[in-house]
Amino acid sequence: MFKRLTVVLLATLALTACERVDPNSPLGQRKAIFKDMLNTSEDLGGMLRGRLPFDGMRFAEGAVKLDTLAHEPWQHFPQARDGGGSSARPEVWERQARFHDLARQLEGVTGELVGVTRSQPLDAAGLKAPMDRVEAACKACHTEFRNH
């Protein structure tokens, strides 16, 4: 009985280890950046939709963080498709010009969002349209290039 349990536990551990992504790999690095982008975007959107209290300074800081993050993940997409565990469709590598075009669009709209936050005090209503453009840029890339 003990021997059988040991075999099952070792097999489970081996399978779990196979599913982990090396955090230093290109896949691991871009996943971490995208997760940080998602969390930051959700906080900003939450402030504009009333899920979180609106704090102009915090929103402005989050916009700068999101803009910085928006420039980072693209360097972690290698020229050739990487291994399993990626949510990226093969089209990322097959249509790189379009992929990079959408990346530049995201960088542009996050930069615009930062620009709007420079005029204090911030008005949540005035931030809705620029934030909507950021979310639309994210969605456009996900629709074309991400497996859901």
Predicted regions and their residues:
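Sequence context surrounding c-type heme c attachment/ligation sites in exported
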Residues: E19-G56, A63-H148
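C-terminal motif of bacterial Sec signal peptides marking the signal peptidase cleavage site
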Residues: A14-A17
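Alpha-helical transmembrane segments
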Residues: L9-T12
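Bacterial N-terminal signal peptides that target proteins for export
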Residues: M1-V7
